[in-house]
Structure formats: structure tokens, C-alpha cells
């Protein structure tokens, strides 16, 4: 792949089909795992669709490399799915999008982002923006435009009690989204098309939640926890959390 406009001279951009060695490196050495809260690694459905990305859809996975050292510095994971372009047909979240893609192979008409990850040593260099640009390039090359993005708002954990509908409407002084990650997408031309209050589901025993959050959950109820974008509900020893996202659309 050609590096997007605005890339530093040292940046190389590849698909996982072009550099399967780096895809395996990221998986085997868990290069990006520390970027996510532990609870986020245990979605009810995520393994089924994240597990389908390679090798079946290696040409849709983006890898950013520091060519001076051949170091993998960022990754963009995407999935192809059927979408007719209407809001009625828009999946209600990332889980639904991923499961639709897995359950309806060969019917894809659009590309959905799943995750954009940047090595902590390379953050602050606008690489997340370049990952999104590269996702758009992949979508065009595969004939899968537009690019959908179920955006996980990066500051939502600061406001876990604010409904995602309200949070998504907040703007900064320049009229762009208040949330930094949403703002990255907006500055690249994306627009908000919907919110997904129950985008990703995580249900697990209280003991797991206690290990993930370093908290104690003495009884039933709703709990705010570190890194959570919304409260988690504990009932009869099982904690259920629905992570909210914001659907943003890159028309390309």
C-alpha cells in the first residue's frame, strides 16, 4: 500500500496480506493488548468476529511500520459486511456488525472499522489519523466504500453516567465533536449517523469483574468502574456491561 498523504517519511503502510509476519507478531507478542482496559478483552461475541480477520480478510487489515527499524507501530482492524446504506439496516453496534459479517460471508457492500491501535511509544504523532486514512484506502481498493466506524469515544470514561446520545452531541468551540477520537474522524470528513448504546456486550461472573477492575462488588446494583464508558449491572453474581459507541460514516 501507499502511505497516506501527510505520513512521515519513515512510515510504511501494508496490509496483513503483504506482511503476515507482522500480523502474527502483533498477535503472538500481544503488541497492542496493553492499550485496552482488561475487561475489553472479554466481549461475549468479539472472539468470533475478530478471529475471522486473518487469513480470510488479510487484505483488509492495515499495518503501519517504522521502516527504519521494521517495527510495527500501529494497526487497523476492519471487517467487510453487508449494509444497504440506510439507517434502518445499520447494525445496532460493533457486535452486530461483526456477527453480520461472519454470518453473511460473500455479501459485503461496505467496510467497518473495528479497532485502530497505536504503540504507546509512537502516540502523539497523529498515527491514529493515518490508520483511519489507510482504512479508507483499503475500502476503496476493495470496492467496499463507504467506511463505517463504531467509534469508542476516548473520553467517555470520564462521563460514564452521561447517556451516549447526549455525549455524542457535545461539541468544542470550533463545532467539532467534544470527544478527541470522534474529532479525529470528523476532521477526516466523517459524520455522526447514529449512536449505539449497547454496541458491545461483556457478561461475566463477579470474580472476573473484580480481577479486571480491582474493585469489589458486594451485591446487586449498578456500578461505575475504572475505564468503563457506562455503568455495569451486577445481578445474582453476574456482571453485564454494554459498551456504547457512536456510528460515524466516511463517505469516501
Predicted region positions:
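Short, conserved beta-strand edge motifs with alternating hydrophobic and charged residues
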Residues: 148-151, 193-195
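Short beta-strand-to-coil "C-cap" segments at the C-terminal boundary of structured domains/repeats
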Residues: 249-252
Amino acid at each position: 500500500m501507499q502511505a497516506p498523504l501527510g505520513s512521515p517519511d519513515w512510515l510504511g503502510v501494508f496490509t496483513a496480506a503483504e506482511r503476515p509476519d507482522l500480523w502474527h507478531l502483533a498477535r503472538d507478542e500481544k503488541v497492542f493488548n496493553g492499550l485496552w482496559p482488561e475487561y475489553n478483552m472479554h466481549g461475549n461475541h468479539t472472539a468470533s468476529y475478530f478471529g475471522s480477520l486473518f487469513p480470510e480478510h488479510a487484505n483488509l487489515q492495515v499495518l503501519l511500520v517504522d521502516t527504519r527499524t521494521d517495527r510495527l507501530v500501529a494497526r487497523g482492524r476492519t471487517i467487510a459486511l453487508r449494509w444497504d446504506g440506510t439507517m434502518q439496516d445499520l447494525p445496532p453496534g460493533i457486535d452486530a456488525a461483526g456477527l453480520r459479517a461472519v454470518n453473511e460471508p460473500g455479501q459485503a457492500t461496505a467496510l467497518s472499522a473495528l479497532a485502530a491501535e497505536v504503540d504507546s511509544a509512537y502516540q502523539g504523532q497523529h498515527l491514529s489519523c493515518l490508520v483511519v486514512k489507510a482504512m479508507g484506502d483499503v475500502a476503496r481498493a476493495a470496492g467496499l466504500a463507504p467506511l463505517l466506524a463504531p467509534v469508542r469515544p476516548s473520553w467517555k470514561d470520564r462521563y460514564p453516567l452521561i447517556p451516549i446520545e447526549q455525549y455524542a452531541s457535545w461539541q468544542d468551540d470550533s463545532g467539532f465533536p467534544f470527544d478527541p477520537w470522534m474529532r479525529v474522524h470528523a476532521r477526516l470528513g466523517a459524520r455522526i449517523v447514529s449512536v449505539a448504546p449497547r454496541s458491545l456486550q461483556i457478561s461475566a461472573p463477579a470474580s472476573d469483574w473484580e480481577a479486571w477492575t480491582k474493585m469489589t462488588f458486594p451485591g446487586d446494583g449498578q456500578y461505575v468502574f475504572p475505564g468503563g464508558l457506562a455503568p455495569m449491572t451486577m445481578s445474582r453474581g453476574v456482571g453485564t456491561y454494554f459498551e456504547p459507541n457512536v456510528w460515524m460514516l466516511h463517505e469516501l
